[in-house]
From Swiss-Prot:
Protein name as annotated: Histidinol dehydrogenase
EC category name: oxidoreductase
Family matches, as Pfam families: Histidinol_dh
GO biological processes: L-histidine biosynthetic process
EC nos: 1.1.1.23
Organism of derivation: Blochmanniella pennsylvanica (strain BPEN)
Binding site for Zn(2+): Q262, H265, D363, H422
PANTHER family: HISTIDINE BIOSYNTHESIS TRIFUNCTIONAL PROTEIN (PTHR21256:SF2), HISTIDINOL DEHYDROGENASE HDH (PTHR21256)
Source organism phylogeny: Bacteria, Pseudomonadati, Pseudomonadota, Gammaproteobacteria, Enterobacterales
Residues the entry annotates as binding NAD(+): Y133, Q191, N214
Amino acid sequence: MISHEHPISIYWNDCSKSEQKKLLTRPINNKLNDIYINVKNILTKVYNEGDRALFKFNFDFDNVQTTQLQIPTEIIMNSGRNLSNEIKQAIHTAMTNITRFHQAQCYSEIIVETLPGVYCQQIIRPLNIVGLYVPGGTAPLLSTVMMLGVPARIAKCKRVILCSPPPIPDVIIYTAQLCGIDEIYQIGGSQSIAAMGFGTESIPKVDKIFGPGNIWVTEAKRQINLAPNGAAIDMLAGPSEILIIADNTANPIFIAADLLSQSEHGPDSHAILITPYSCIAEKTKKELHKQLKILPRNDIVRNVLLNSRMIITNNLMECFSISNSYAPEHLIIQIENASDYLHYITNAGSIFLGNWSPETAGDYASGPNHVLPTYGRAVATSGLGVIDFQKRMSVQQLTQNGLLQLSSTITTLTQIEQLKAHEYAITHRINYIKEQNEHSLLG
């Protein structure tokens, strides 16, 4: 049972360096080795047995007897029949905002003449076949369909498939259809990642796999990414996390609501409040317990709060420094004139400024993607975007004059690196040009 002392308020500057480091350390799953072995066995079975293994896993894991994996076109076309206008309008509004934001991300192709006669281009091409994974659970995660399907459509991927555990709710199928996805397969978990990574009789092998999932799905993505005949992946997502920076103008009701909203994602979620004001921490703590009573999933949230932190600092600058070290998936800055402090933030998956920007808005409908780096990976990686569904290719074209101008530079560098064949690739051409010029003069 969680006491009213939790989460415990901790004064940052009263802690040693090792204690400070421990405060920002994410929970570690002690069952990783067992999961690794079990996932490896699932992947091997799918690789060897294809669809037959998938049908068996559907029965074993989801207690569903399937005779076909692909959702028929007729079901896709009729998926919105039993959905209310209110639901359809909410999906439409969210998709409009997500589309608007992601369309603005599109990169322009470039061409640069680095020297006279040396033309360099960068061109963009969509990925050919991509696989989207949408987790199952107690409620349909249609927001994930939009966050994956919209950028895939904008990127103009040639073929997009979607996998989700059976039975797939109509609202998931309907949302996928709106995203232009007409290949939907009823298979979930590690086995769906294996199917997309290796390919089976029914499910095509994809170039890249996208989407969040539990620790089994994440481990499957990791193994598929490392397999020589596997597929690329978007990222390895860990448990969800939120960090809130608050000053004395912040509303404890809002802070508590945001901490709780993130905590209900699962028992491994991480929630941290950092503030220079102990009174804000205490008021938030009281509000947490008040709001906790009305939540239907409060057992999960209670466990998360046991491992949550309320860190008291000397000033706001210290808050920013701690946040950058932690590199949260979601960062909420509930301080006065929050946008004035944005330049102090260097590491975060997604940032929410001010009292009126709850993390929930980003989860569903404001526009940016909610597939974000976790476990501190925001120090080097970004949230999902259109570019993740595309690839950049460089193009170079040199004229004779361009090669002549660049040849001495190239040959000098090849000689330093002692790569003689590289040097000859230049000198043979230069000699040919000189011979042609001599013949022209003689002719």
